[in-house]
């Protein structure tokens, strides 16, 4: 792994280093406080540009109450995917060194909150055209390494995997930080909030949450669990190492090919088993039909044979 000096990108003529960090954990685990502190430290100590996207600040207020461990309503899920699309538009502008345009299909209130989020962190400036639909990137956004920290519960693995797919699409660094906080502490903190979630929601999420599992999911190998509320000096060093590793080892397209091949292999195997099952079912069905037909035809054929025998005997007599 390269040193922190290399990761700053100073004097480098290569492409800008970009990373996505998924910050996940139960509600009131301390994620937002942690994200702000991490952003400040990375800017001060590393000179990196940091963009903290707190989902609670960008998602429409009407849907914040839906952030529970129940199955995601379709509209809520679509809004999460829409926010990822906003992030992709920002990343495309950074990667291509151009203005950031607004997506044609957007939720206006959420888009405005996203723009405010970027402006407040000095990453974009005012609209660059009369239509107010494109924005200029600031020098901060393009002059060195840039880390996007996504602050949300991300309690389902599938939610985090969508972010990983975005990192893979553009060969970005990717890592996950899980804030491990006791259920009791989360409930206590939540109770002190002006807009507290129902306690049963946090209890349910505590049972449903899918923590990062690097042993099971190869794409989650760059993950770190930190005990909240305290972050020890040792954990702080591990966190820095995690972020540096992510920047210096972006997700490669070859990983996409390997995963796709594995997916294709599983699909192929599933199809073969399905075809074999269908063939077996047809054979069994045909065999049963033939057996049933024989049972139905048997007595009638035997009766006709007897009649023929009797008639022949009478004729001979």
Segment roles from a protein language model:
Residues 1-20, 44-48:
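Extreme N-terminal, non-catalytic leader segments
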Residues 16, 32-139, 143-146, 159, ...:
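Conserved substrate/cofactor phosphate-moiety recognition/catalytic segment
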Residues 23:
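Hydrophobic anchor at the beta1->P-loop junction of P-loop NTPases
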Residues 28-29:
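ATP-binding Walker
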Residues 148-152:
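Structural recognition of the conserved hydrophobic beta-strand(s) that form the central parallel beta-sheet
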Residues 181-317:
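Conserved GTP-binding G-domain of TRAFAC-class P-loop NTPases and closely related GTPase folds
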